From Swiss-Prot:
This is Penaeidin-3n. It is found in: Cytoplasmic granule. The keyword Transferase does not apply. The modification Pyrrolidone carboxylic acid is found at residue 20. Disulfide bonds join 44-59, 48-66. The lineage of its organism: Eukaryota, Metazoa, Ecdysozoa, Arthropoda, Crustacea. One of its GO terms (molecular function) is chitin binding. Belongs to the penaeidin family. The modification Serine amide is found at residue 74. One of its GO terms (cellular component) is cytoplasm.
């Protein structure tokens, strides 16, 4: 008898966890709002020493600054 009660409890718990047995507000996954990642302005240095031209272009595109002084990239 205990085994039957235990199996029924586990089956009902599994249905609740899947959101099929109980359609309340707490069985659904919580949707988090999309948060844009914060880009550090220190990711691209002003002197741009030691980075490739591709990285300089990426910095120019993302941050709106060009690394033309050290790399010769005019953006």
């Amino acid at each position: 008898m205990r085994l039957v009660v235990c199996l029924v409890f586990l089956a009902s718990f599994a249905l609740v966890c899947q959101g099929q047995g109980y359609k309340g507000p707490y069985t659904r996954p919580i949707l988090r709002p999309y948060v844009r990642p914060v880009v550090s302005y220190n990711a691209c240095t002003l002197s741009c020493r030691g980075i490739t031209t591709t990285q300089a272009r990426s910095c120019s595109t993302r941050l709106g600054r060009c690394c033309h002084v050290a790399k010769g990239y005019s953006g």
